[in-house]
Amino acid sequence: MGSSMHVGVIGCSGRTGKVIVSALEQSSEYTLGPGFSRSSALTLFQVIAHNDVLVDFSHPLLTKEVVAHLLISPKPLIIGTTGFPGKCKEAHDSLEELTHIVPVVVCPNASLGAYIHKRLVMLLSQLCNPQFDIRIRETHHRYKKDSLSGTAQDLLDTIQQVKQEDWGEEYEVGQRDSSKKTIEVQSSRVGDIPGEHEVAFISSGEQILVRHTVFSRNVFGRGILSILDWLKTLNPQPGLYSLGDTLELVLRNEHCLLKKTTDH
């Protein structure tokens, strides 16, 4: 992929979509291509044809359509749409088919801090025994339609997987119940908060709390640029990738810069 990579944003009129569009407009590494929204003059096929990479932060039904179009005209895809592919078998199958053709990055939250937060939650899920109750609490702006957020759902899935693999315990979502292991999940939609996710591990005598708070939506734009850097630099093979796969490059680069600074 060349330095003049054209990037199209699906869902370009949404809150996150606008942030990504702004980040691309200010970038010297990438060219903002035509995007797609409800008011687009171009068809989805035309938008795909005019771009080298697609970034999708839209709606599960539209993302499903995007994947179907890309199976005909393959392009690398970054998906940040909440609830995709969800439990829809057809969406899962189409996405899997696309990953055999092009690299696809699925990232419910594109910020570096969210990735670090998730890693910490994974570690605590391994270390905290079943005597610790677990609570996930997420807060977003009043206009956010989805509840649970994609990031909170990803944290929930991560905790359930780790508890199953490391402790052999099945955790369900719900209020605390002595007869089964549960994870309490709370959602709040207030004000203009870009996003806050908090996971608590609570025993009878202590609490461990990890929280990630977004102060500016610009972090999502920077995160997408980091993923694009990864695509351009490594030119990965077709496959399904996570934000963690792409941010390892960013973390290594930052470590090298820090080492150079301290060496001087």
Swiss-Prot record:
NADP(+) binds at residue 38. The active site is at 140 (proton donor/acceptor), 144 (proton donor). (S)-2,3,4,5-tetrahydrodipicolinate binds at residues 141, 150-151. Gene3D superfamilies: Dihydrodipicolinate Reductase, domain 2 (3.30.360.10), NAD(P)-binding Rossmann-like Domain (3.40.50.720). It is found in: Cytoplasm. It catalyses: (S)-2,3,4,5-tetrahydrodipicolinate + NAD(+) + H2O = (2S,4S)-4-hydroxy-2,3,4,5-tetrahydrodipicolinate + NADH + H(+); (S)-2,3,4,5-tetrahydrodipicolinate + NADP(+) + H2O = (2S,4S)-4-hydroxy-2,3,4,5-tetrahydrodipicolinate + NADPH + H(+). PROSITE patterns: DAPB. Keywords: Amino-acid biosynthesis, Cytoplasm, Diaminopimelate biosynthesis, Lysine biosynthesis, NAD, NADP, Oxidoreductase. NAD(+) binds at residues 11-16, 80-82. Belongs to the DapB family. Catalyzes the conversion of 4-hydroxy-tetrahydrodipicolinate (HTPA) to tetrahydrodipicolinate. This is 4-hydroxy-tetrahydrodipicolinate reductase. It comes from Chlamydia pneumoniae. The gene is dapB.
